[in-house]
């Protein structure tokens, strides 16, 4: 490590950064379906076939497009991302947080860990702000048609990507380096320098992981899911809860900035402590 303080913000996507499931904005309407009907069909199929829910919805996307003769390509999904509606303040959030980090001498990095589709996220207005996007994704044949899940990110699988960010092993095909032993002081982003933002039960594995290893977990809410988020706080599964408002000066921004400030101080103190130990040990 070069001594640079890196703070990583890890985001769920649907209902955390945008107002609803990303498929609801453009993809499902292109099928002539209501979102409620699509998700009921996908979930019923998954339960009937005892299938992972993420694989079930990805299969249902392919099947419905074939049935209705709707083109389904990487580019058509990217175009769906252009219709995503974000919560207030999201458009300027990343630049503001980055500038704040720079003032503190902190390198802030943003990551997505989502059960939604990478192709749709890639087409969204904020895709360029993320160092890496971990989300479900299709593999396409030579004609450009999706034929297999390239990556399926369910709720518990999300934790794998927290470890990847911790070690700096971002390539999902590199399991050897990910699973190799690595000294804590060689890990690129300590867990104590991570903030996870999510919206509910699907984020609990990552939120619990943050709290277990010294990171911070924040749940954001809309009116509909506020009771569930308040329950997460009562149960000690998250550190803070806020309305899904990323505007300048809102409570969420103020708290995230204070957390980053504290992480920067703690990192510098830890570096000083280890430097003194090395000096007295003659190493």
Model-derived segments and their meaning:
Residues 1-2, 191:
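Short, basic/aromatic recognition patches
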Residues 2-142, 238:
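Alpha-helical substrate-recognition element adjacent to the catalytic core
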Residues 88-111, 115-283:
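C-terminal cap/substrate-recognition subdomain and adjoining C-terminal extension
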């Amino acid at each position: 490590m070069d001594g640079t303080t890196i703070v990583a913000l890890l985001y769920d996507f649907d209902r955390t950064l945008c107002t609803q499931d990303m498929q609801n904005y453009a993809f499902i309407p292109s099928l002539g379906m209501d979102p409620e009907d699509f998700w009921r069909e996908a979930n019923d199929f998954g339960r009937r076939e005892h299938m992972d829910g993420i694989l079930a919805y990805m299969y249902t996307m392919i099947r419905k497009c074939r049935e209705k003769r709707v083109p389904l390509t990487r580019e058509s999904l990217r175009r769906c991302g252009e219709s995503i509606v974000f919560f207030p303040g999201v458009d300027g959030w990343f630049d503001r947080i980055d500038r704040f980090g720079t003032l503190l001498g902190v390198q802030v990095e943003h990551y997505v860990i989502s059960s939604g589709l990478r192709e749709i996220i890639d087409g969204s207005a904020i895709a360029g702000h993320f160092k890496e996007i971990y989300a479900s994704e299709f593999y396409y044949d030579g004609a450009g048609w999706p034929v297999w899940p390239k990556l399926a990110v369910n709720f518990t699988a999300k934790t794998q990507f927290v470890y990847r960010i911790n070690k700096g092993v971002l390539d999902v095909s590199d399991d050897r380096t990910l699973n190799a032993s690595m000294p804590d002081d060689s890990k690129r982003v300590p867990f104590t320098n991570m903030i996870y933002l999510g919206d509910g039960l699907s984020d609990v594995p990552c939120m619990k992981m943050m709290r277990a290893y010294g990171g911070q977990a924040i749940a954001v809410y809309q009116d509909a899911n506020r009771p569930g988020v308040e329950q997460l706080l009562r149960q000690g599964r998250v550190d803070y809860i806020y309305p899904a408002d990323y505007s300048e000066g809102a409570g969420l921004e103020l708290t995230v900035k204070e957390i980053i400030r504290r992480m920067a101080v703690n990192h510098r103190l830890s570096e000083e402590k280890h430097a003194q130990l090395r000096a007295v040990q003659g190493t």
